[in-house]
Amino acid sequence: MKKIFRWVALGAMAFTSVFTARADEGMWLPSLIENRIADMHEKGFRLSAEDIYSINQASLKDAVVLFGRGCTGELISPEGLLLTNHHCGYGQIQQHSSVEHDYLRDGFWAMSRSEELPNKGLTVSFLERMEDVTPIILKGYTSDMTEDERVALVKKNSAALIEEAVKDGNGLRAKVEALYYGNQYFLFLYREYSDIRLVGAPPSSIGKFGGDTDNWMWPRHTGDFSIFRIYADKDNNPAAYSLDNVPYKPKKYFHISAKGVQEGDFTFIYGFNCMAVCNLNPLDILPIISQKIAFKYISSICLDTNGEEVSN
């Protein structure tokens, strides 16, 4: 039996480590991982908290990117190669497909850099830093304010903070996220690159094998990947698409190992999660129990009944 620890940042990053024994879960932001590092070391983790998240040196946060607005990507070469899921690059693969060149059906591989395909509107964002800005966002709040007044204050203070955070430009993008039902606010500062080119993708029969049904319902046997490359200007800064751009030089990238893992190895996933509902209160859980679970049960009965009718 394996022991699973899960760190999830709402709108930010997620970790998962696997070890032996019982299940155990929790939620932590990468910037707060120092609070968990001793426990991780006891279970076989060999890196420091600074190796995971640091604003002073290259760390894992510099090799894990936000692909588009909802996917995770990983830098896997010193020349800006980026690995992400097949479904994350699906839209770009489709846009480049035609009757003559059906890349969704047949796959695509650029044999040279000149064959790599640009993708208008696609961005890749590197997290520069995250910080707790709760006192700044709630400055001016009083207990006698209405909820509408509180929302307006948060919006005003967030806009001012974001404007200040990105004033240096050069691809900076900032976002203020509310955590724990608005009891805590974090500023996330990203550096965003927009010259992202498709390098390779397997046929959908491999990359999307089993479709969404297998994705959500069953263990998967899928080559779920696509490969892109980030391009930058000659100074490694974000730049609009140009033939003069050069492959991005990452601060850190992952080395792919073909050795695999052994039973009980400490493993660890770091990425941008779509959503998290680990801190639901009882009032939020009740509709799930009374409606969603009941609906699934009724649906399963209907499916079983249809199966019997077909067999008869």
Each language-model region and where it sits:
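Terminal presequence/propeptide segments associated with secretion/organelle targeting
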Residues: K2-F5, G11, F19-N312
